[in-house]
C-alpha cells in the first residue's frame, strides 16, 4: 500500500464506473484510478486519476497491479467489453488482489415486446432480412462489418464516434450519446420509418428507452445476448453495492458520503 491510501483500480468508463469513481474518490483514505479502453475519442471526465489504453493482456495487467501497488480491483466494464473481464480475473488471482465485478442486470422482455435473441452480431445480420428493411442499429460502431454485406437494407446507425469501413452501403449515421428519452426514440423510429431494431443486451437504463418505443410501435427487436464472463468472481449489480464491498474490505476508511 502506498502512502496516499488504499489504491483502487476501476476498469471501465460505464455509468456505473463513473458513479463508483465519484463515490470512492471523495474518501481521502482511498486513491482511485479509472482505466478506459480508449475506444471513445472524447470520453467523459472521471474523478480521481485516469489512464487510457490496454494493459497488454493479463500479464500486463498483473504487472501494473504490482507496480502501482493496487489494493483492490473493480471490473465495471461494459457487458460487451471483450476479454478484459477474463484478463482481470486472471491478473487478480496471479497477484492476490481482491476483485469485484459490477454487472448491471440485463433487460427483460415484457408483454408486447417482440424480441428475437441471437448469440452474435453475425447472427443478428443473418436474421435481419426476414424481420424488416429499415434497421436501427444501436450496437456501436465497432461491429458494423457484420452487416456490410446487406446491400438491400437501409440502416440508421447511432454511435458516439463516427464509424469506419467496412460498413453497410445504405446507411445514415447519427452521432449521439445517451441517456435517451422515450419521446425522442419514438420520434426517431417514426421519422426514419424504422421497422426493425438491433441492440446488444447492455442492460443500461440510459439506453432502454428505445425498447419502450419499439414495443409501442410494434417494431421487432434483435437482441444480441451477452458473452460469457469468468466464473467465481464476486458480483454486484451497481455502484452502491460496490462501495459497500470496499467499505467492508477496508473498514478503517472513513464513512462514505
Locations of regions flagged by a protein language model:
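SAM-dependent methyltransferases
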Residues: 1-72, 82-86, 92-102, 108-111, ...
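K/E-rich alpha-helical interaction surfaces of small helical-bundle regulatory domains
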Residues: 76-77
Amino acid at each position: 500500500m502506498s502512502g496516499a491510501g488504499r489504491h483502487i483500480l476501476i476498469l471501465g468508463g460505464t455509468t456505473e464506473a463513473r458513479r463508483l469513481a465519484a463515490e470512492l474518490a471523495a474518501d481521502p483514505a482511498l486513491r482511485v484510478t479509472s482505466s478506459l479502453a480508449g475506444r471513445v475519442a472524447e470520453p467523459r471526465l472521471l474523478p480521481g486519476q485516469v489512464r487510457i489504453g490496454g494493459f497488454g493482456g493479463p500479464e500486463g495487467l498483473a504487472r501494473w497491479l504490482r507496480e502501482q501497488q493496487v489494493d483492490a480491483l473493480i471490473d465495471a466494464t461494459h457487458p460487451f467489453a471483450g476479454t478484459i473481464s477474463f484478463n482481470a480475473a486472471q491478473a487478480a488471482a496471479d497477484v492476490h488482489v481482491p476483485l469485484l465485478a459490477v454487472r448491471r442486470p440485463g433487460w427483460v422482455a415484457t408483454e408486447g415486446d417482440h424480441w428475437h435473441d441471437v448469440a452474435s452480431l453475425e447472427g443478428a445480420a443473418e436474421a435481419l432480412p426476414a424481420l424488416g428493411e429499415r434497421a436501427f442499429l444501436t450496437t456501436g460502431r465497432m461491429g458494423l462489418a457484420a452487416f456490410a454485406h446487406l446491400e438491400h437494407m437501409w440502416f440508421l446507425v447511432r454511435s458516439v464516434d463516427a464509424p469506419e469501413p467496412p460498413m453497410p452501403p445504405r446507411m445514415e449515421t447519427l452521432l449521439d450519446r445517451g441517456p435517451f428519452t422515450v419521446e425522442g426514440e419514438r420520434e426517431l423510429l417514426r421519422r426514419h420509418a424504422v421497422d426493425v431494431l438491433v441492440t446488444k443486451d447492455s442492460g443500461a437504463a440510459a439506453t432502454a428507452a428505445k425498447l419502450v418505443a419499439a414495443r409501442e410501435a410494434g417494431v421487432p427487436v434483435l437482441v444480441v445476448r451477452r458473452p460469457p464472463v469468468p466464473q467465481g468472481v464476486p458480483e454486484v449489480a451497481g455502484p452502491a453495492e460496490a462501495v459497500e464491498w470496499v467499505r467492508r474490505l477496508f473498514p478503517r476508511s472513513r464513512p462514505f458520503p
